[in-house]
Amino acid sequence: MADARSIRQQNQRSWDAVVPAHASHHRDVPTFVRAGGSSLFPEERALLGDVQGCSLIHLMCNTGLDTLSLANHGAVVTGVDISTAAITQARQWASDSGIQATFIQADIYDYLAETRDTYDRVYASYGTICWLNDLHAWANGIARILAPNGRFVLVEFHPTSNMFDAQWQLARAYPMGGRQLDIEGVGDYVAASGGGLSPTGFAAGVHDFVNPEPCHLFQWGVGEVVTALASAGLRITRLDEYLFCNGERPFADMVELPGRRMVAPPHVPDIPLLYGVAATKE
């Protein structure tokens, strides 16, 4: 069995392969953010609070559209991601838009252990937890880089949604325990969202992308995430669950509401599809 670092390096290769496909579906990001546009949803904005003048780091920031949006809300932003392709794209969008942002390519565990910087806000969102092989090292790293009275915010896909197959039938056990899940590769979920993840305007871009690089996920329950943060000395101030998805369409028959909000079709009972956590360092 591969060691954790080798797994993360393989995941980096999978992300590097898919980033050009994802980026191809966004129309003119620099113009969008230069005009003050924001890709953020109300849920993360509410949990983050007023970020005007705050130093903020966006962990596992991908290509940085949300990071640049946070700058438009007044934060002094840094984004960190393991993918070289993602950080290259983020830096290009920042340069072309004139938005001030720092983007760092690094393994998240290395960054959290080695940086000397601290931040008023630490933010992670939408598909980050599944790439973490060690929740406690992650949470301890967050506590380390938070400034006193700083706030950590997570908005994430609810693991309950992974229990269902494409027809909304219960098919799998609740994801937890850090079980490793090996899949063919990071897919083109931006294309599959049909514009839900392209607030700048959807472009057809790359068609029928197939990732040649497999990847490896880790399955964690909500309780495990919250416990890791609390064990790191953070005080949990909010734990919210939401009966909708923002942007992404994990089931093909989801109904899109205004604001790029995706809900289950009428015949499906409500289940939590997202959750949000806010925690402070005291």
Model-derived features with residue positions:
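N-terminal, positively charged/glycine-rich alpha-helical extensions of SAM-dependent methyltransferases
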Residues: 1-29
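Conserved alpha-helix/loop element of class I SAM-dependent methyltransferases that forms part
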Residues: 27-54
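Class I SAM-dependent methyltransferase SAM/SAH-binding core
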Residues: 54-111
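A short acidic, Gly/Pro-enriched loop at the edge of an enzyme's catalytic core
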Residues: 113-122
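A short glycine-rich, Lys/Arg-flanked "PGG" loop and its adjoining helix->strand segment in the class I
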Residues: 136-151
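Conserved class I S-adenosyl-L-methionine
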Residues: 151-203
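Short alpha-helix
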Residues: 216-239
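Core SAM-dependent methyltransferase catalytic element
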Residues: 232-234, 256-258, 262-282
